[in-house]
Structure formats: C-alpha cells, structure tokens
Amino acid sequence: MSTVSIKGLEGEAPTKNEVLLNWIAENVELFQPDRVVFADGSQEEWDRLTTQLVESGTLIRLNEEKRPNSFLARSNPADVARVESRTFICTPTPEGAGPTNHWADPAEMKAELTERFRGSMKGRTMYVVPFCMGPINDPAPKLGVQLTDSEYVVLSMRIMTRMGAEALAKIGDTGSFVPCLHSVGAPLEPGQEDVAWPCNEEKYITHFPETKEIWSYGSGYGGNAILAKKCYALRIASVMAKEEGWMAEHMLILKLTSPEKKVYYIAAAFPSACGKTNLAMLQPTIDGWSAEVVGDDIAWLRFGEDGRLYAINPENGFFGVAPGTNYSSNPNAMRTMEPGNTLFTNVALTDDGDIWWEDLENMPEHLTDWLGNDWTPESSQPSSHPNSRYCVPLAQCPVAAEEYNDPQGVPISAILFGGRRPDTVPLVSQAHNWDHATMIGALLSSGQTAAAEGTVGALRHDPMAMLPFIGYNAADYLQHWIDMGKKGGDKMPEVFLVNWFRRGDDGRFLWPGFGDNSRVLKWIVDRIEGRVEADETIAGYTARVEDLDLTGLDTPIEDIREALSAPAAQWKSDLADNEEYLTFLGSKGSAVPAEVLEQFEALKARVAAAES
C-alpha cells in the first residue's frame, strides 16, 4: 500500500511505483485538476471517452454502417499542425541544441512553463497515460507516462501506442519512464462553459535531453500533444540512441518478399510530402513480389547479436495526412480505415455522416467543411485542412507484417533516402559506402514546387529527413551516423538514393511512381544480391535502364533513361548551396565529421571530371 496521497484520485492508484506516484502527486498540486484518472486502455474507457466527447461537441460520431466506431474532430483553426517555431531543445548550452533547433535554457524554460502550468487543469480531469514504445513484450522496453487534460490525446494515444494497464505493469514498482507533461492551457472556472477544442494562443513544445523530459503547453493537436510521437520517438529517443549506441530515425520499415520467397526489410527516410506512407503500404506491380508494412513513420535501429542492424517500429498506429490519400495512391491505407475504429481530424463531413477530403474518389455535391461551414465543389477553399489526419490502428492494415510486434525487430538490408527533386538526382543510385551514404543523407533536400511558398526550384534542406526532429546538435548527429558505420562495418545495410519525382522539360513526371516503385526496389534487391552491374555517375552507382524490370510498363524508354541521368551542370549548380549548408551544420559548437567533408570533396571532384 502506497503512502502517497493523490488529490482527486478515486480509489487506490493501480501502481505502487513511488517515483511515479510522487511525480503525479507533485503535478496534481501544480496543475490543480478536479479529478485524476489512470487511463487503462480498455474498450470501456474508449467508449466512455468518445461518448463524453460527442456530448461535449469535440467529436462527431460518424455513420456506423460506413465508419463503425469512428469519429471526426474539428480543431481550433489556430491549432492545426506541429509548431516548429515554438518547439525547443533545452540543453545547458546553445551548442548542445546545435544550429537546427530552437534553444532555451532549461532552468528558465521550466520556470516559465511551471507558471503556465499552475492551475491550467482547473475544472478538468488529469489523465495518467502510461505507454510503451514498441512491442509490449520487449524485454528492455522504453516506457513513458504522459499527464494530460485532453481526452482527445488519451484516445489518440490508445491508437498510436501500447497504452494503459499493460504499459503500467511494464513500468512496475521500480521501473523508470520518460515523464511527459501536457496541458491544453485552458482552465475552466466554476460554471464556465467549455469549448469544443480547448487550446491556448501561447504554445510551447519543450524537450529536456539531459533529464529525458517532455513538457508541452497550449496545443491539443497531433505531434504537439501526442507526446509519444515525434517528441519521444524521435527528439528524446535520438538523444538516448546516441548515448546508448543505436539510432532513432524518421523512416518507414517495409517488408519485401521476392518470387523465390526470400524476405528483405527496407527502411526509408523521406521528407514530408515525398510518399513515405505510400511506399510503406506499397502494392507491387511486378509479378511474384509482395510488400507488407512494419512501420510508416519511425524506425528504431539497434545492432543484433549477429552484428546486423535491426529495426522496430515504436508506434502502434498510423497518423497519416488525409488529403491525397485514395484507392489509387494508397489503397492499403484506405482499406486500413474500412473496419472503423478511426479518429479523423479536420476533414470534411458528408451529409450522410461519412468523411471526405481532397483527391478522395466520388466528390459529393455538398459537404460540411473542416471549419463547420457548407461546402460545394464550387467553393474556393479546400473542404479539408491540408494537414488533416486519420489516426487508425496498425493492426487493421491488410498488409501489416506480423513482425511489427516482434521486439527483436527486423534485419535491415537497405536504407533509402529520397526527396522531391524535379531534376539533378537520378531515379535510383547506390552509395559507395557508409561515409558516402552519410553525406547523401546530410544533404537530402526537396525542391520547392509552384504550390509552395518560396522560389520554385529552391532547395529545402532536410538532413536524413530529421531536420525538425534531431534532439541535439546536428553535427554530432552526423558523427553518430559515422560512428555507427564504423561499429557495424561490412554488416551495415546498403544505402540508396531514390527520386520518384524527376520531371521532363515540359513538366511531366518521367517515372510513374506509386506501385511501380516496386521495380526500383527489385533493382535494389538485385544490387544487394550482386546480380546486376551499375553505371558510375556523380550520384553513385546508378541503375542502367536495361537492368530495371519494365515488364508491362508503358512509360517511354527515353523518359526512364532521362530519369536515370545525373546531369553534371545540375549537380554543379547544387554544390555552392550544399557547401554552405554543411558550413551551417558545423556552425554551432560541433564540427561536421571529417568523413562527410571528405565525401563532399570527392563529390566536387566527380562533378569536375564529368564536366571536362
């Protein structure tokens, strides 16, 4: 029996962990909630909370025949996405956070947020949400506990993590956990009516790498509030990984099976809007090949006993961008939602209680848009917010690989980097070695499109697709990649650079993409197995058109040949920008690894040789 008293808790706490109970009790005094509830992750809890939120107007219950046990939330229009400008890495010195993060002094930030948190849960319930990152049966699990005043967050965490009583049992009486504090920052005075989506104009998403803590205030949305996702799984985990000799990466994990039934596991890091979820749920268009998903967003990679790199998916669900997802671009994502049990946010509502978003089939004549207004096809604004989301259990995916529940993880054969480049970067190239791969990842970028703000064609750098998520100095992060390569030696995965987005002079895409990307994956497997040669280009070992399986593809061979080219003039025009970016990455307390700089000098030499 614990001696710790928690104000507002009905009955006895379901744990004897004194550290956990004392932490909860201290924060109850700070936040001053009306009630304290331990989230158990049960169906009864889901039903109770969803019913409560439907009654309060936060959720809309969808058509039970079309979307069983599914709900739509509409957020405050000022709370619709991750707020990178209000995301802080709080290390003792600015050099610890490095050039790519917003830094704040840990003591000052804690003092400021403590005052923000004081009384911020008045009139609300504090939920204690224990969760496990990755399979619950992991013998050495990474655990966390989030305190939150948002029922929406509790529901989202139930989908996205292994949450509740099982995770609390894993923490046990003496186990450690990452403490996560979250408040929407909207206290209620007695008699004050609540709003459908409580939040605060002031937002803080703060990380304390030294003490492995996460404090978030003011937002109820997505990665700002579901703290297991980017905050823990990438920002804090990347620090843990550096300290403990593993990797936390913004990567999908794909299981690929050949016609001979040989299995390959591929991890891939793409910046946003570059097709990560679509590749994770790939439907191959070449006979005899099948693909399954282990994860669509985050990979934790550790060395196995055999010296190879093994990956787990620390998540348990998909938190996908809705617009653009349909039965053509990603049929498996659509099928994952068909059984229901899905939380939709900021999409449109049909008149018969279903959902709709841009690029979905069968546009209705009338909708209620994400702001609650009437919408017709003639409306000038999109019906759904561009960052609207579906949150759905991974287990419902028809191509979910059973290995996603294996705590040993899966051995990675290849790592892919890819951006959205209309020119320059070939369809697929292999890195010369791990050091070359690290440079490729460090300089990963996407070209601006006409749809984006900024100069068309200008590069947006996103090293390893981790720019918003590296929890420490980016130069030290690159050094960690180099160090992992040294440790793994010749057992490290082969690394490839892909680009599905090459365009011709007239602006058309040169490669069909989507399911046909399986043809590129087949070439990658052929390279791993030593079955095909490659052309030595500026980019690396680039595929030859005759080695790609183009059976049944009606794309002109000239287009594919152009997609595989690495024009020297285009590579040369990137060099100054890339050199400047490497200088930037090394500009705050830590140097970019010598190996990366040597690889960049070798790249410059290849460009010069190709020009002569």
UniProtKB/Swiss-Prot annotation:
Q: Record's HAMAP family?
A: PEPCK_GTP (MF_00452)
Which residues does the Swiss-Prot or TrEMBL record annotate as the active site? 274
Localization per Swiss-Prot or TrEMBL: Cytoplasm
Annotated EC: 4.1.1.32
- Any one of the GO CC terms: cytosol
Q: How does it assemble?
A: Monomer.
- Biological role: Catalyzes the conversion of oxaloacetate (OAA) to phosphoenolpyruvate (PEP), the rate-limiting step in the metabolic pathway that produces glucose from lactate and other precursors derived from the citric acid cycle.
Positions that bind GTP: 273-278, 389, 420, 514-517
Source organism: Corynebacterium diphtheriae (strain ATCC 700971 / NCTC 13129 / Biotype gravis)
User: What terms describe the molecular function in GO for this protein?
Assistant: GTP binding; manganese ion binding; phosphoenolpyruvate carboxykinase (GTP) activity
Q: Which residues bind Mn(2+)?
A: 230, 250, 297
Q: GO biological process: any one?
A: oxaloacetate metabolic process
Which pathway is it part of?
A: Carbohydrate biosynthesis; gluconeogenesis
Family in the record: Belongs to the phosphoenolpyruvate carboxykinase [GTP] family.
Just give the chief location class. Answer: cytoplasm
Does this UniProt record's set of keywords contain Protein biosynthesis?
A: no
Give me the residues that bind substrate, please: 82, 221-223, 272, 387-389
Q: Does the keyword Transmembrane apply?
A: no
Catalysed reaction per UniProt? oxaloacetate + GTP = phosphoenolpyruvate + GDP + CO2
> Any idea what this protein is called?
Phosphoenolpyruvate carboxykinase [GTP]
| Record NCBIfam families | PRK04210.1
